[in-house]
Amino acid sequence: MDYNKVTEWYLKIRDDFKVYTYYVGYDPWNANYWIDQMKEIGFDMIQVRQGAQTMSNPMKQLEADLIDKKVIYNNNPVLKWCLLNTSVFRDTNDNIRPIKGQKQRARIDGAVSLIIAYCVLFEKYNDYINLQGGRAKDE
């Protein structure tokens, strides 16, 4: 993966479209250079470990929001494909995390990215509410 391309994408949506990313969630595995690069530019990086304890509640909420059609993804075919490729691992404590299904070569990266975004939302929910003028979007 070319992390420079990812950084360029974040800068492009900020500079060209005035979309300001308050937090960027990331999996710490093999991303040290990119994390430092993004911090130097001014992005607030939030580490999200890809384990059941970390991802369980956000993943369950994402599932509920997808069912309730609260997630707008414009029927993106790549994200839809990644979501369809994603299966659930459940531990003995009923915590869940995403895994690849039977097709081990299939990609789940888009689904995992969305779950990471939900993990950041869970961690920074009060900041999100403040950005919305003190109330949740669906109130």
Name each region found by the language model:
Residues 62-70:
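Active-site proximal helix-loop segment of RNase H-like, two-metal nucleases, encompassing DDE(D)
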Residues 1-50, 60, 73, 77-139:
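RNase H-like, metal-dependent nuclease domains and their acidic two-metal-ion catalytic environment used
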Residues 54-63:
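Short, charged, surface-exposed secondary-structure boundary motifs
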